[in-house]
């Protein structure tokens, strides 16, 4: 005879499974809504409503971002998602919508770029400010805290994180992004020459990126939430180069590492974090978006962020956020025992 406790446990498990399925369905509907809004604005023109435009993505991010902040348990990730959602909705969405604020720009874009969206537009003021921030604080300054591409993937796409394909082969596929990044560099130069052919290059690039970008939404349940960031994003390639040569990195304490590979499992970008920890003692790669999942999931706090601020610190403080944040881990044996207890 099944006990009441067992029945309650089974009922709770059924409820959680149904809840996960509902969240996935709603998340995919949110992704589809963003795609339909873009298609309406660019191709089909079914409606003139702002609710069916490129703003559809920002609206969906605002709704699902609020939910993510409410349910996220890790303090660092909760703060990051809150700031990311606020920046996407406010800086990218409301600011350009309410105020047609032009910004200084060179060449073809002079007088056209607006605050917010100018961040991904070459030769604008915010674009150059973004480059500076990436050099000082890493790609995370844009990609993890102020990018609608990531906003979509860390809110609606979060329901499909576990579907992320991680293997040696998919890690090599990261080089695909250099194709679009190469075109982006051509655009970077072309906008300096404001003549008729420049318009063709700009419009074709924008259209091509738009189709691939919004098309990637529809396959997130198959590839995981970071498909665009990992393999296709031309802006990520640009920022990634500065990420590599700049001051940002994730430093590791190899003495603390217990090779549990939780950092690998936590990384949505498919970076073999543990391999870099063992061989180089740090993670300093083009692909790191600085989301901090490897740092916050490390059970022994062996990983920490490093950026320009650490140049002015005598002893860089350890990053909090791991599973054992509130415990004093002075001895390696204690750390291992505490980790085993978490399993």
Language-model regions: role of each:
Residues 1-277, 281, 286, 301-343:
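Non-ligating segments of multi-cofactor redox enzymes
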Residues 288-292:
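Cysteine-rich micro-motifs
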């Amino acid at each position: 005879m099944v006990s009441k406790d067992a029945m309650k446990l089974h009922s709770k498990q059924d409820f959680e499974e149904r809840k996960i399925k509902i969240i996935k369905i709603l998340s995919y509907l949110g992704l589809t809504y963003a795609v339909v809004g873009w298609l309406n604005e660019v191709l089909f023109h079914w409606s003139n409503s702002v609710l069916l435009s490129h703003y559809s993505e920002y609206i969906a991010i605002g709704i699902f971002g609020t939910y993510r902040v409410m349910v996220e348990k890790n303090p660092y990730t909760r703060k990051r998602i809150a700031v990311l959602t606020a920046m996407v909705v406010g800086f990218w969405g409301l600011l350009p919508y309410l105020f047609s604020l032009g910004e200084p720009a060179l060449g073809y874009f002079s007088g056209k770029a607006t605050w917010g969206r100018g961040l991904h537009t070459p030769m604008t003021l915010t674009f150059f400010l973004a480059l500076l921030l990436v050099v000082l604080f890493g790609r995370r300054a844009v990609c993890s805290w102020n990018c609608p591409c990531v906003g979509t993937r860390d809110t609606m796409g979060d329901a499909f994180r576990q579907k992320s394909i991680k293997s040696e082969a998919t890690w090599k596929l990261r080089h695909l992004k250099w194709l679009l990044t190469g075109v982006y560099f051509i655009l970077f130069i072309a906008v300096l020459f404001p003549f008729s052919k420049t318009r063709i290059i700009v419009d074709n690039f924008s259209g091509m990126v738009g189709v691939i970008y919004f098309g990637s939404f529809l396959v997130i349940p198959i590839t995981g939430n970071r498909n665009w960031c990992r393999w296709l994003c031309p802006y990520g390639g640009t920022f990634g180069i500065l990420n590599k040569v700049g001051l940002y990195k994730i430093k590791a304490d190899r003495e603390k590492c217990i090779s549990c590979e939780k950092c690998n499992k936590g990384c949505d970008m498919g970076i073999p974090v543990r391999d870099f920890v063992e061989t180089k003692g740090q993670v300093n790669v083009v692909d790191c978006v600085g989301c901090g999942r490897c740092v916050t999931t490390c059970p022994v706090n062996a990983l920490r962020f490093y950026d320009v601020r650490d140049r002015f610190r005598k002893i860089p403080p350890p990053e909090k956020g791991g599973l054992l944040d509130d415990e004093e881990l002075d001895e390696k044996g204690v750390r291992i025992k505490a980790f085993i207890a978490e399993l």
